[in-house]
Amino acid sequence: DNDSTRSEEQWKGFEVRIYENMERIFRILEETDTKATFFVIGWIAKTYPDIVRQIASKYQVGSHTMNHQLVWQQSREAFKEDVSSSIKLLEDITGQKVEAFRAPGFSIRESEGWAFEILHELGIRMDSSVFPAHHAHGGMPSYVSAVPSWVEYNGIRMKEFPIVYRKILGKHIVFSGGGYFRLVPYRLLRKWTRECPEYLLAYMH
């Protein structure tokens, strides 16, 4: 989703760190007995199928599209083909049905509700694309639920696991993932985390 590194050819030129980093992630998850879903882009699956099979042996594997293109940059037809291709690839590699999805950059906005209809058609039953605040690539600041809930569009219902937020001065402030782990002071992270006994979703990219 970054114009400076959009092509697969450019990705191939970067240093390979996935094996070392995945071992660290697996170790942390095991030591803390933490559940996880890995939303995998198709390019990673094609390039490192052994890693995807290793993930699937212990954790849920979900689709993150083929090449991390933002939803609102695509037509309905292109989005359907994109997600369908990624699901087929992941299912062929893992031998397991793919039922979870996260949009690149949390790029399903209020105006892209049609994406849920397509996801449902493709067999997706759990989504984690809703970013209930403003975001550079999308976001749904009008979304009010801070716990697992349902999204509805044209008669379909899908289980949604939204990103966690705090409401401060009337605004939704996200804190539990990505760059927010670096921006939010640790004392606040710890305090807000402890104040989420019912549901806490953390994410890393």
Question: What residue spans do the PLM features occupy?
Answer:
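Catalytic alpha-helical scaffold of carbohydrate-active enzymes acting on polysaccharides/glycoconjugates
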Residues: 1-169, 184-205
